[in-house]
């Protein structure tokens, strides 16, 4: 299956996925070139240059059970970020581990894995996201987050 087909399957709910909301913040800079993060924290500083949203309803360890199970196996991870006006998506590999973090979700370009990692070897970090989307997030708008996994066969 192609990456485009995987994105479409996740968007249509035909693959294990979880959908929840977070919120942008005036201090979103999205300048980090190695990772991106969504946090449950209600506030962020400009030093958190990987953080693209706060006030998340979920952290990595709180994702739907079928998503957590799929993250522990081989597959393609799709992260879709949608404000209603602007959207972007990130593709990565499953970490082959079940995340347990109760505070954050992290997508990494590297192969590093910790308790918050939901994707490794991703094609984008915070700095690679659509800048129109980042501008909207800086205004503090609500963000619809979709995390899905297309298992490898």
Regions found by a protein language model. Give the residues of each.
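Conserved mixed alpha/beta catalytic, RNA-binding, or beta-rich assembly cores of soluble enzyme
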Residues: 3, 7-152
């Amino acid at each position: 299956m192609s990456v485009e087909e995987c994105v479409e399957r996740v968007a249509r709910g035909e693959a294990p996925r979880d959908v929840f909301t977070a919120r942008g913040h005036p201090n979103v800079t999205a300048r980090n070139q190695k990772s991106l993060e969504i946090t449950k924290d209600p506030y962020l500083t400009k030093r958190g240059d990987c953080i693209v949203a706060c006030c998340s309803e979920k952290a990595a360890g709180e994702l739907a059970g079928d998503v957590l199970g799929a993250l522990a196996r081989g597959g393609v991870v799709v992260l879709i970020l949608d404000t209603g006006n602007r959207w972007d998506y990130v593709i990565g590999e499953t970490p082959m581990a079940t995340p347990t973090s109760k505070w954050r979700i992290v997508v990494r370009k590297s192969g590093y894995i910790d308790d918050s990692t939901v994707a490794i070897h991703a094609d984008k970090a915070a700095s690679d996201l659509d800048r129109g989307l980042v501008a909207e997030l800086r205004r503090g708008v609500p963000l619809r987050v979709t995390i899905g996994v297309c298992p490898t066969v």
